[in-house]
């Protein structure tokens, strides 16, 4: 078994214009010797990020991209608002550079004004934050990364990649009582929506790869927007629309761990003129999934915000059809974030069809769950995690839908651990790959939380959760017990666990007819060239 069995070699990325795969003398499209740590929950990530930024000195470099940034979101207690933390860093002489998505109108629940205010706060302190609308019509920059580089102290360098924005709702912890600084979701989530999310902390040479992703976007000479109205508004507001020159990229940090990391992305086939670093777009996230799923034999464990679109899940369905031992667990939001008469079916119709496709392929080997906290409030699942056969693990900004795989900018990292896991079963896939410590520990940490099974990273796991078949059954039993307790009027103590069996609601025919075309156009659009769409290739 080699890395090339699981990871994309440079020619398989499908984008010869990027600098990513040519950064190393050996020509490998991944970096070895990293230390990758999953930071489960926004509170864990924010606490570490606050400590890291606070320790930065003059001459250090802080780079970030975000979908939404709220300047008043606290990383910790009072005085730790993200705008203030970044501003103080810039005032100390840290070089602070950011790219925020310049959104569509706030009236349709996007984030233009908050992004503008965060950018202004950083600029006033001496940093630079650009509002970047270089996307397809209706698209967004969805990448979420922070890179901290330290002049003369490369052992402190770290990059964060995953699903957590620097904004409201994200600062939740394992109790899932929600962020006190909240934005409204569907009413079922209450005034402080519980929020489940994951970010990856990377140390080692992969930090240089993540920085290179930022630099490609920052150095794009294209205007930040093609819209004459947007450019006029920027002129009126005196927005910074010209990226200053970045200091030269320093050498990658030295190897410090056992994790091989591959950086994968989505960029759309941008109309008229593409990105200089991806003229025809890049769909390496989709390609990475397709390659890894060809080796799936035992268990695919997913946590995802959406899980939409038969055009995306067909590669999962094909794996289920080919291999009768393969099981799939998906943890998703029980209720979409918007619950209007038309927005609800627009968000549901793609998921309903995707789950139908998966169940046709895998039958009762496919199980889908929502989460609730101990008060019975649904937990909004915003994590984007996939673990295959305890070997291949992915954490990123990308969801399982056609938008994330083709239309918006996305950033994810695949981790392949060089350390085999000694716990049984040692080779759940049966192909000689052997379970890997990182992938298995990530799956177990997430499953333990959802089962209220205790334990933590690095602690001995219950044997039943290491075994994919037993873990599949443990989820089913926990959800059945909690469903029965709710269905019976909640008699006696609440059963352990947070899992509820997901059952897709029935949509009236009229809603389906109206929602289907709007879903394809507005909610889950396709950013591929027409030939790829017809062949459903990536």
Report residues per predicted region.
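Charged, low-complexity intrinsically disordered terminal segments
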Residues: 2-538
